């Protein structure tokens, strides 16, 4: 499920209405940040407002809050700039190596995302979107194929 949380965060597929941390602090997501493909936190340069204070830094995502400890982040200074810990399950309060608490957000997985995952996993079609093709108008299809046609010329 962690990879699904990454996807939801990266593409902002969550409801931003009345978001609250696990400590019931009002939070507003300004920028989800840049996805990190190397070691260290999952996203860099994120910006959030928590209880009226703007925070800028990194975001780490785990299925369970306790994964923070299991992965050794609690003693790793690379994670001291984490401003938000996104989890599916809040089973532990987490801290940086200097013992300051890290705000946590339980990111709910939207029903539509779960439905799409279920559909993709249970569909045997080699073209996952074939049923939706008739709904796309011809002009859109021409526009989509234009870069390919330009490359052929």
Question: Predicted regions span which residues?
Answer:
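N-terminal ordered "arm"
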Residues: 7-66, 73, 79
């Amino acid at each position: 499920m962690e990879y699904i949380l990454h996807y939801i965060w990266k593409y902002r597929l969550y409801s931003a209405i009345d978001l609250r941390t696990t400590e019931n602090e009002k939070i507003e997501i300004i920028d989800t940040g840049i996805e990190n493909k190397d070691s260290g936190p999952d996203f860099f340069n994120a910006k959030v407002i928590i209880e009226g204070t703007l925070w800028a830094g990194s975001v780490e995502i785990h299925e369970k809050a306790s994964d923070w400890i299991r992965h050794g982040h609690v003693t790793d200074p690379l994670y001291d700039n984490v401003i938000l810990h996104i989890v599916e399950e809040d089973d532990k309060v987490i801290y940086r190596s200097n013992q300051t608490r890290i705000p946590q957000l339980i990111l709910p997985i939207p029903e539509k995302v779960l439905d799409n995952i279920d559909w993709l996993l249970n569909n045997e079609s080699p073209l996952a979107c074939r049923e939706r093709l008739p709904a796309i108008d011809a002009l859109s299809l021409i526009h989509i194929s234009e870069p390919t046609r330009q490359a052929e010329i």
